[in-house]
Curated annotation (Swiss-Prot):
The keyword DNA-binding applies. A motif (RPON box) lies at residues 470-478. The lineage of its organism: Bacteria, Pseudomonadati, Pseudomonadota, Gammaproteobacteria, Alteromonadales. The gene is rpoN. Pfam families: Sigma54_AID, Sigma54_CBD, Sigma54_DBD. Belongs to the sigma-54 factor family. Residues 54-92 are annotated as: Disordered. GO terms for cellular component: DNA-directed RNA polymerase complex. It comes from Shewanella violacea (strain JCM 10179 / CIP 106290 / LMG 19151 / DSS12). This is RNA polymerase sigma-54 factor. Sigma factors are initiation factors that promote the attachment of RNA polymerase to specific initiation sites and are then released. This sigma factor recognizes a DNA element, designated as region A upstream of the pressure-regulated operon. GO terms for molecular function: DNA binding; DNA-binding transcription activator activity; nucleotidyltransferase activity; sigma factor activity.
Length: 492
């Protein structure tokens, strides 16, 4: 056996640091992008703010894009001709110089899951409102008002909710609540029954009297076939203090569980929320800066990047010229290295703007009906539709439409809003799920409140318009819009 040298030729895909940077910038929101730019300005002396620059860096193109003739459908237009290219192509199209250098507690182990509560119904005629400011008390009151209670049970439910603290625990005993109500006709069993119903409110685990009850309520939502659920129940019911004290040896001795079984049961318990009330907290106001503006001028829809939202940076020519004049080799390498980083950063920004503009233009062209007539005219559209039209990969479309917002005459929308699934129609066409939601909202708004429409009736009405929708689909869309069922919408 001897050592030898061999020369081989082959092809290999490589994700360069420059391409990684371009992809990362593409998926940043406008606020995150501003922070990224500020960080680049702070760390790279070759970058500077160009206060005199008016247009965003889009390779010298006019930022305003005429959507041309929207009377034709997006399908018949074929791929859109645009000088913009994908991020990877933008990075490689210009040759660049070669000098670029290149002990845990319960609080620690518990990972909060996203709040399951849906947001308020959205009014598309209003600007983007961000998160709801609803607190725990308001959230429970809202659910109480949607629950069919008798007059006595409604009063009991109100008293129970008023006794729940911000963590979600009941701070008064059943006897204290009974005494505070002062109604001789109400019995302790009635309060217990109403409490059980409230404990099924969102968030699950609410109105528990202690930690053990809180966790058992949540565990009851799991299927009985869930692995290790029986062991988890035993641990919560009988040995919660030992879990808190992390006395695993004593736990294994008392429960006769092997180490692996005990670990699995504890991991299941750690998925539960010991303070469910904190999952519903008043949300802070969220402000959205639109990335794209859509306006109608002389009967034609115009798409433009938001000039106030686009970075205005350039290379500091004074420092760049010092790369040749300096006599120190170390200084020269420092300047040349930062110069290349600055050029790549600016090029990545240009590519981001080009891609965002190109995709936004295609969305507006595809969804012209929405801009003209509203949600009911929304066409079914998936990522692949736009990807084929602009000749980019679906992953690129996904990145450029996430956390990017479009300011339109109908409100501010995330670009992802314009994508929706489809439902077949009798004439062989398709209707988007967004349009179906709009139809449901319209039907509910116009219904006789003494005889509200059931899900089955709405399905029949949509079928009369040629839209085939199952009753279960109607119920799913209705619940997503926080519209109560027909029996709870009925009024005199």
């Amino acid at each position: 056996m001897k050592a030898s040298l061999q020369l081989k030729m082959g092809q290999q895909l490589t994700m360069t640091p420059q391409l990684q940077q371009a992809i990362r910038l593409l998926q940043l929101s406008s606020l995150e992008l501003q922070q990224e730019i500020q960080q680049a300005l702070d760390s790279n002396p070759l970058l500077e703010l160009d206060e005199e620059q008016v247009d965003p860096p889009v390779n010298g193109e006019d930022k305003t894009v005429d959507t041309e003739d929207f009377s034709a459908t997006a399908e018949s237009d074929g791929p859109i001709d645009n000088s913009a290219v994908e991020t990877s192509e933008a990075i490689t199209r210009d040759s660049m110089p070669e000098e670029l250098p290149m002990d845990t507690t319960w609080d620690e182990v518990y990972t909060a899951s996203p709040n399951s509560t849906s947001g308020a119904m959205r009014d598309d005629d209003m600007p983007f409102q961000g998160e709801t400011s609803e607190g725990l008390y308001e959230h429970l009151e809202w659910q109480k008002n949607l629950t069919p209670f008798s007059d006595n049970d409604l009063a009991i439910a109100t008293a129970i909710i008023e006794a729940i603290d911000e963590r979600g625990y009941l701070t008064q005993s059943i006897e204290d609540i009974l005494e505070a109500m002062g109604d001789p006709e109400i019995e302790q069993d009635e309060i217990e029954a109403v409490l059980k119903r409230i404990q099924h409110f969102d968030p699950i685990g609410i109105a528990a009297r202690d930690l053990s009850e809180c966790l058992l309520i949540q565990l009851a939502q799991y299927a009985d076939t869930t692995p290790h659920i029986d062991n988890a129940r035993i641990l919560i019911r009988d040995h919660l203090d030992l879990i808190a004290g992390r006395d695993f040896r004593l736990l294994m001795r008392k429960t006769k569980l092997k180490e692996d079984a005990l670990r699995d049961a504890i991991e299941l318990i750690q998925t539960l929320n010991p303070r469910p009330g904190l999952a519903v907290t008043p949300g802070k106001d969220e402000y959205v800066i639109p990335d794209v503006t859509v306006t109608k001028k002389k009967g034609r829809w115009m798409v433009e990047l938001n000039p106030d939202n686009m970075p205005k940076i350039s290379v500091n020519q004074h420092y760049a010229s010092m790369a040749k004049s300096t006599k120190s080799q170390a200084d020269s390498q420092f300047i040349r290295g930062h110069l290349q980083e600055a050029k790549w950063f600016i090029k990545s920004l240009e590519s981001r703007n080009e891609t965002l503009l190109k995709v936004s233009k295609c969305i507006v062209k595809f969804q012209q009906g929405f801009f003209e007539f509203g949600e009911e005219a929304m066409k079914p559209m998936v990522l692949n539709d736009i990807a084929e039209a602009v000749e980019m990969h679906e992953s690129t479309i996904s990145r450029v439409t996430t956390q990017k917002y479009m300011h339109t005459p109908r409100g501010i929308f995330e670009l992802k809003y314009f994508f929706s699934s489809h439902v077949a129609t009798d004439d062989g066409g398709e209707c988007s799920s967004t349009a179906i939601r709009a139809f449901i909202k319209k039907l509910v708004a116009a219904e006789n409140q003494q005889k509200p429409l059931s899900d089955s009736k709405m399905a029949l009405l949509l079928a009369d318009q040629g839209i085939k929708v199952a009753r279960r689909t109607i119920a799913k869309y209705r619940e997503a819009m926080l519209i109560p069922p027909s029996n709870q919408r009925k009024s005199l």
